[in-house]
Amino acid sequence: MTLVYIALGSNLASPLEQVQAAIHALGEIPHSRVVAVSSFYRTPPLGPQDQPDYLNAAVALDTTLTPDALLDHTQRIELQQGRVRKAERWGPRTLDLDIMLFGDAVINSERLTVPHYDMKNRGFMLWPLFEIAPDLHFPDGLALRAVLDNLGAEKPASW
């Protein structure tokens, strides 16, 4: 089994229900099981500010799937919950599932970049991850705690 960390975010169509349904759906992925779920956090949007706040969370998932197979499942879950992929970056969305870490793997493919390309600059991804994996080290050896301290991002409010 490989321990994978997935970031969840939603700011449309009842975010709490969206994220709860996504956590349930992640638990239904074959050859996988949810082993930890963070609290739910309220964070301001990244990019355009004329949209609702986000609900952000993190899930730890044990899986025997390949990274691409897991990505197929996370994208299927997003689509089933009404995710529409638009050219607009950082726009509002019903559900966003990002594979932040896939064990100690470093992946740079057309479909997937792991560790997530900008997670070390995003407190809304790091704080939920820190809650469920406070002793985590990134594949490059950096401690999550040190990255959070360096970023200086305040812990987000609870949802």
Name every feature range the model reports, one short phrase each.
Residues M1-S32, V37-P44:
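N-terminal beta1-alpha1 ligand-phosphate binding loop
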